[in-house]
Design a protein with these regions (language model features):
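Bacterial N-terminal signal peptides that target proteins for export
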Residues: 5-28
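A short, hydrophobic/aromatic-rich structural module that often spans a beta strand
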Residues: 145-161, 225-243, 264-272
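Amphipathic/hydrophobic helical signal segments and adjacent flexible N-terminal regions
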Residues: 40-94, 98-134, 240-278
Length: 278
Protein backbone atom coordinates (compact mmCIF):
# COMPACT_ATOMS: atom_id res chain seq x y z
CA UNK A 1 0.00 0.00 0.00
CA UNK A 2 1.38 3.42 -0.96
CA UNK A 3 1.69 6.35 1.43
CA UNK A 4 -1.21 8.02 -0.38
CA UNK A 5 -3.39 4.91 -0.05
CA UNK A 6 -2.49 4.62 3.64
CA UNK A 7 -3.43 8.25 4.24
CA UNK A 8 -6.70 7.80 2.39
CA UNK A 9 -7.58 4.71 4.45
CA UNK A 10 -6.83 6.51 7.70
CA UNK A 11 -9.00 9.44 6.65
CA UNK A 12 -11.81 7.06 5.70
CA UNK A 13 -11.60 5.39 9.10
CA UNK A 14 -11.69 8.76 10.83
CA UNK A 15 -14.72 9.80 8.77
CA UNK A 16 -16.44 6.54 9.73
CA UNK A 17 -15.79 7.17 13.41
CA UNK A 18 -17.09 10.73 13.08
CA UNK A 19 -20.24 9.53 11.31
CA UNK A 20 -20.88 6.95 14.06
CA UNK A 21 -20.32 9.59 16.72
CA UNK A 22 -22.64 11.98 14.92
CA UNK A 23 -25.35 9.32 14.64
CA UNK A 24 -24.99 8.49 18.33
CA UNK A 25 -25.33 12.16 19.30
CA UNK A 26 -28.41 12.53 17.08
CA UNK A 27 -29.98 9.39 18.57
CA UNK A 28 -29.41 10.59 22.14
CA UNK A 29 -30.74 14.04 21.26
CA UNK A 30 -33.88 12.62 19.66
CA UNK A 31 -34.45 10.33 22.65
CA UNK A 32 -34.32 13.29 25.02
CA UNK A 33 -36.55 15.45 22.82
CA UNK A 34 -39.10 12.69 22.25
CA UNK A 35 -39.15 11.82 25.94
CA UNK A 36 -39.66 15.47 26.87
CA UNK A 37 -42.33 15.91 24.21
CA UNK A 38 -44.19 12.74 25.22
CA UNK A 39 -44.09 13.75 28.86
CA UNK A 40 -45.47 17.20 28.17
CA UNK A 41 -48.10 15.92 25.73
CA UNK A 42 -49.25 13.30 28.21
CA UNK A 43 -49.30 15.86 30.99
CA UNK A 44 -51.25 18.29 28.83
CA UNK A 45 -54.14 15.81 28.79
CA UNK A 46 -54.62 16.47 32.50
CA UNK A 47 -55.22 20.15 31.88
CA UNK A 48 -57.16 19.98 28.61
CA UNK A 49 -60.27 19.92 30.78
CA UNK A 50 -59.54 23.42 32.07
CA UNK A 51 -58.75 22.04 35.52
CA UNK A 52 -56.03 23.88 37.39
CA UNK A 53 -54.54 23.52 40.85
CA UNK A 54 -55.83 25.75 43.60
CA UNK A 55 -53.50 28.53 44.76
CA UNK A 56 -53.86 27.88 48.50
CA UNK A 57 -55.68 25.46 50.81
CA UNK A 58 -57.26 26.09 54.23
CA UNK A 59 -55.00 25.56 57.24
CA UNK A 60 -55.26 22.23 59.02
CA UNK A 61 -56.83 22.15 62.47
CA UNK A 62 -54.74 22.23 65.65
CA UNK A 63 -55.35 18.54 66.44
CA UNK A 64 -53.66 17.55 63.16
CA UNK A 65 -50.52 19.65 63.57
CA UNK A 66 -47.05 18.50 64.67
CA UNK A 67 -46.81 17.88 68.40
CA UNK A 68 -50.42 16.81 68.81
CA UNK A 69 -51.42 13.19 69.40
CA UNK A 70 -53.20 11.76 66.38
CA UNK A 71 -56.67 10.39 67.15
CA UNK A 72 -58.16 8.50 64.22
CA UNK A 73 -61.51 7.95 65.95
CA UNK A 74 -62.02 11.72 66.17
CA UNK A 75 -61.33 12.04 62.46
CA UNK A 76 -63.73 9.20 61.64
CA UNK A 77 -66.53 10.80 63.66
CA UNK A 78 -67.70 12.45 60.45
CA UNK A 79 -69.76 9.96 58.45
CA UNK A 80 -68.86 8.94 54.91
CA UNK A 81 -70.88 10.05 51.93
CA UNK A 82 -72.60 7.41 49.80
CA UNK A 83 -71.61 8.55 46.31
CA UNK A 84 -71.10 6.28 43.30
CA UNK A 85 -69.68 7.08 39.86
CA UNK A 86 -70.26 5.05 36.71
CA UNK A 87 -66.98 4.10 35.02
CA UNK A 88 -66.12 2.85 31.52
CA UNK A 89 -65.43 -0.88 31.35
CA UNK A 90 -61.76 -0.39 30.36
CA UNK A 91 -61.10 1.38 33.68
CA UNK A 92 -62.51 -1.36 35.88
CA UNK A 93 -60.48 -4.08 37.57
CA UNK A 94 -57.35 -4.25 39.70
CA UNK A 95 -54.28 -2.38 38.45
CA UNK A 96 -50.62 -2.79 39.32
CA UNK A 97 -48.27 0.20 39.21
CA UNK A 98 -44.60 -0.65 38.65
CA UNK A 99 -42.93 2.68 37.98
CA UNK A 100 -43.71 6.31 37.26
CA UNK A 101 -41.84 9.05 35.43
CA UNK A 102 -41.72 12.58 36.82
CA UNK A 103 -41.68 14.99 33.88
CA UNK A 104 -41.96 18.25 35.83
CA UNK A 105 -41.00 19.26 39.36
CA UNK A 106 -41.28 22.67 40.99
CA UNK A 107 -40.21 23.92 44.41
CA UNK A 108 -42.36 26.93 45.30
CA UNK A 109 -40.11 27.97 48.17
CA UNK A 110 -36.92 28.22 46.10
CA UNK A 111 -38.50 28.78 42.68
CA UNK A 112 -36.49 25.91 41.20
CA UNK A 113 -38.05 24.08 38.23
CA UNK A 114 -36.79 20.73 36.93
CA UNK A 115 -38.10 19.33 33.62
CA UNK A 116 -35.60 16.48 33.32
CA UNK A 117 -37.59 13.19 33.10
CA UNK A 118 -36.91 10.98 36.11
CA UNK A 119 -38.22 7.40 36.36
CA UNK A 120 -38.57 5.69 39.74
CA UNK A 121 -40.15 2.56 41.21
CA UNK A 122 -43.63 3.14 42.65
CA UNK A 123 -45.14 -0.25 43.37
CA UNK A 124 -48.75 -0.36 44.52
CA UNK A 125 -52.11 -1.80 43.49
CA UNK A 126 -55.50 -0.14 43.21
CA UNK A 127 -58.99 -1.17 42.20
CA UNK A 128 -61.81 0.56 40.34
CA UNK A 129 -65.36 -0.71 39.95
CA UNK A 130 -67.38 -2.44 42.68
CA UNK A 131 -70.98 -3.08 41.59
CA UNK A 132 -72.93 -3.72 38.37
CA UNK A 133 -76.35 -2.24 37.66
CA UNK A 134 -79.24 -4.00 35.92
CA UNK A 135 -77.97 -2.89 32.48
CA UNK A 136 -74.41 -4.08 33.07
CA UNK A 137 -72.94 -0.66 33.89
CA UNK A 138 -70.07 -0.74 36.40
CA UNK A 139 -70.03 1.69 39.32
CA UNK A 140 -67.33 2.70 41.81
CA UNK A 141 -67.93 3.72 45.42
CA UNK A 142 -66.59 7.16 46.40
CA UNK A 143 -67.20 7.38 50.12
CA UNK A 144 -65.43 10.44 51.50
CA UNK A 145 -63.82 11.22 53.82
CA UNK A 146 -61.71 8.07 54.18
CA UNK A 147 -58.17 7.19 55.22
CA UNK A 148 -55.32 4.81 54.47
CA UNK A 149 -52.26 4.01 56.57
CA UNK A 150 -48.76 2.89 55.62
CA UNK A 151 -46.24 1.77 58.26
CA UNK A 152 -42.69 2.73 57.32
CA UNK A 153 -39.43 2.13 59.17
CA UNK A 154 -39.17 5.64 60.63
CA UNK A 155 -42.81 6.71 60.89
CA UNK A 156 -46.43 5.89 60.12
CA UNK A 157 -48.01 7.79 57.22
CA UNK A 158 -51.76 8.38 57.24
CA UNK A 159 -53.62 9.79 54.24
CA UNK A 160 -56.86 11.53 55.20
CA UNK A 161 -58.76 11.93 51.92
CA UNK A 162 -61.20 14.80 52.33
CA UNK A 163 -62.69 14.89 48.83
CA UNK A 164 -62.52 13.03 45.52
CA UNK A 165 -64.41 14.71 42.70
CA UNK A 166 -64.81 12.94 39.36
CA UNK A 167 -65.00 15.43 36.50
CA UNK A 168 -65.06 13.06 33.52
CA UNK A 169 -65.77 9.33 33.33
CA UNK A 170 -66.48 8.17 29.78
CA UNK A 171 -64.99 6.02 27.02
CA UNK A 172 -62.33 8.63 26.25
CA UNK A 173 -61.00 9.10 29.75
CA UNK A 174 -61.49 9.30 33.50
CA UNK A 175 -60.39 12.39 35.42
CA UNK A 176 -60.76 13.37 39.07
CA UNK A 177 -59.35 15.72 41.71
CA UNK A 178 -58.39 14.48 45.17
CA UNK A 179 -57.62 16.61 48.24
CA UNK A 180 -56.00 15.01 51.28
CA UNK A 181 -54.08 15.72 54.46
CA UNK A 182 -50.94 13.64 54.97
CA UNK A 183 -49.86 12.97 58.56
CA UNK A 184 -46.63 11.36 59.67
CA UNK A 185 -46.54 10.12 63.26
CA UNK A 186 -44.24 8.07 65.48
CA UNK A 187 -44.95 4.77 67.23
CA UNK A 188 -46.92 6.50 70.01
CA UNK A 189 -49.08 8.45 67.52
CA UNK A 190 -47.42 11.81 68.12
CA UNK A 191 -47.61 13.86 64.92
CA UNK A 192 -44.19 14.63 63.44
CA UNK A 193 -45.18 16.29 60.17
CA UNK A 194 -48.36 17.44 58.47
CA UNK A 195 -48.88 18.60 54.89
CA UNK A 196 -51.67 18.68 52.34
CA UNK A 197 -51.95 17.55 48.72
CA UNK A 198 -54.19 18.24 45.77
CA UNK A 199 -53.92 15.69 42.95
CA UNK A 200 -55.40 15.99 39.45
CA UNK A 201 -55.35 12.52 37.90
CA UNK A 202 -56.40 11.33 34.45
CA UNK A 203 -56.57 7.83 32.95
CA UNK A 204 -56.99 6.97 29.26
CA UNK A 205 -57.00 3.63 27.42
CA UNK A 206 -53.52 2.56 26.29
CA UNK A 207 -52.69 1.26 22.82
CA UNK A 208 -51.82 -2.10 24.40
CA UNK A 209 -54.89 -4.06 25.60
CA UNK A 210 -54.97 -4.52 29.36
CA UNK A 211 -53.10 -1.27 30.04
CA UNK A 212 -54.03 2.32 30.81
CA UNK A 213 -52.10 5.58 30.62
CA UNK A 214 -51.94 7.81 33.67
CA UNK A 215 -51.11 11.49 33.90
CA UNK A 216 -51.09 13.03 37.37
CA UNK A 217 -50.18 16.37 38.84
CA UNK A 218 -49.76 16.59 42.61
CA UNK A 219 -49.36 19.93 44.37
CA UNK A 220 -48.27 19.89 48.01
CA UNK A 221 -49.10 22.52 50.63
CA UNK A 222 -47.82 23.02 54.17
CA UNK A 223 -50.02 22.86 57.26
CA UNK A 224 -50.93 26.53 56.77
CA UNK A 225 -52.14 25.88 53.23
CA UNK A 226 -49.24 27.55 51.42
CA UNK A 227 -47.85 25.75 48.31
CA UNK A 228 -44.52 23.98 48.77
CA UNK A 229 -43.91 21.81 45.69
CA UNK A 230 -45.51 20.24 42.63
CA UNK A 231 -44.74 17.07 40.69
CA UNK A 232 -46.25 16.00 37.35
CA UNK A 233 -45.98 12.29 36.57
CA UNK A 234 -46.86 9.84 33.79
CA UNK A 235 -47.10 6.05 33.81
CA UNK A 236 -48.34 3.07 31.84
CA UNK A 237 -50.23 0.78 34.21
CA UNK A 238 -51.04 -2.89 33.59
CA UNK A 239 -54.16 -4.71 34.71
CA UNK A 240 -53.51 -7.33 37.39
CA UNK A 241 -57.00 -8.85 37.29
CA UNK A 242 -60.31 -8.08 35.54
CA UNK A 243 -63.34 -6.55 37.21
CA UNK A 244 -65.27 -8.59 39.75
CA UNK A 245 -68.02 -7.34 42.04
CA UNK A 246 -67.04 -6.32 45.57
CA UNK A 247 -69.86 -7.02 48.01
CA UNK A 248 -67.98 -6.13 51.21
CA UNK A 249 -65.45 -3.31 51.57
CA UNK A 250 -63.94 -2.11 54.86
CA UNK A 251 -66.76 -3.80 56.73
CA UNK A 252 -69.48 -2.16 54.62
CA UNK A 253 -72.17 -3.88 52.55
CA UNK A 254 -71.44 -2.49 49.09
CA UNK A 255 -74.50 -3.98 47.41
CA UNK A 256 -76.81 -2.41 49.99
CA UNK A 257 -75.07 0.97 49.73
CA UNK A 258 -75.23 0.83 45.93
CA UNK A 259 -78.95 0.15 45.98
CA UNK A 260 -79.50 2.98 48.49
CA UNK A 261 -77.63 5.32 46.14
CA UNK A 262 -79.71 4.31 43.11
CA UNK A 263 -82.95 4.77 45.04
CA UNK A 264 -81.90 8.16 46.48
CA UNK A 265 -80.93 9.41 43.00
CA UNK A 266 -84.15 8.19 41.30
CA UNK A 267 -82.39 5.49 39.30
CA UNK A 268 -84.48 2.55 40.48
CA UNK A 269 -84.60 1.28 36.88
CA UNK A 270 -80.93 0.33 37.34
CA UNK A 271 -81.41 -1.68 40.54
CA UNK A 272 -79.77 -5.12 40.25
CA UNK A 273 -82.12 -8.09 39.89
CA UNK A 274 -81.15 -9.37 43.34
CA UNK A 275 -81.27 -6.00 45.06
CA UNK A 276 -81.61 -6.07 48.87
CA UNK A 277 -85.08 -5.14 50.08
CA UNK A 278 -84.90 -1.61 51.56
Amino acid sequence: MTVLETSYAENANQLGVLRNLRNLIIAVFLTIILGWTFGNQALAKTFELGVEHTEVLPSVSAELRPGAKFNLSAVEAEGQSNVWVKLPEWMCGTWKVGRETAVFRQDFKTGKIDKEPFTYFARHDFQYGMQKDREGGIWHYVGTPYHSKTSLSQFNEIHLVKSKEFRIADEQGVSFTTVMTVIRSNSVSQILETFQQESITSYTPAATPGSIEMTASTKSFDANGKPSRQSNNIATIKQASPFSEVDTYQGKDMKALFCEFLISTDQTNLLPDQAPVP
